[in-house]
Amino acid sequence: MKTHVEVSSARRKQRKAHFASPSHLRQTLMSAHLSKDLRSKYNVRSMPVRKDDEVLIVRGKFKGNKGKVTQVYRKKWAIHVEKISKNKLNGAPYQIPLSASQLVLTKLKLDKSRQSLLTRKAASLKTKGQKHTVA
C-alpha cells in the first residue's frame, strides 16, 4: 500500500533504483543475517557483509560449508568465500560468486566503526515502537 505521495511504488522503478544503486548503498543492501549466537550477543539481526567475516552458507549448492569472506564485489552483487571454487578446463581455479541472502554471519571482523554500528543498531531496536518525545 502506498503511503507517501512523492515515493513511487512502481515495480519497474524500484528495480531500476535497486540495480542502478551506487556502491555506498549497495553495501547496506548486501547485508546478511547474524547467527543465533551473535544475534543474542549483539541484539542485532543483520549486518553488511565485509571482507574477513566468517560465514556459513545456508542456501544453494554449497549449503553447509563455512569459510572466510575473501572479497565483496559490490558492482556484481557478489560475495566470494574462501574454498568455494571450481576449476576451469585448463585447471585454473575460480571463485563462485554468492549472494548475501545465501549466507549467515558466524564471526564478525570488528573495529571501532563496526562496533559503534552494532551499538547504534541495538539501541535503535530497543526503542522501536516507543515515542521519541520526552514528557
UniProtKB/Swiss-Prot annotation:
GO cellular component: large ribosomal subunit
Gene Ontology molecular-function annotations: RNA binding; structural constituent of ribosome
Gene Ontology BP term (one): translation
Region (Disordered): 1-23
SMART domains cross-referenced by the UniProt entry: KOW
Keywords associated with the record: Ribonucleoprotein, Ribosomal protein
Domain of life, per lineage: Eukaryota
InterPro entries per the UniProt record, alphabetical: KOW, Rib_uL2_dom2, Ribosomal_uL24_CS, Ribosomal_uL24_euk/arc, Ribosomal_uL24_KOW, Translation_prot_SH3-like_sf
Similarity annotation: Belongs to the universal ribosomal protein uL24 family.
Protein name: Large ribosomal subunit protein uL24
Protein's organism: Tetrahymena thermophila (strain SB210)
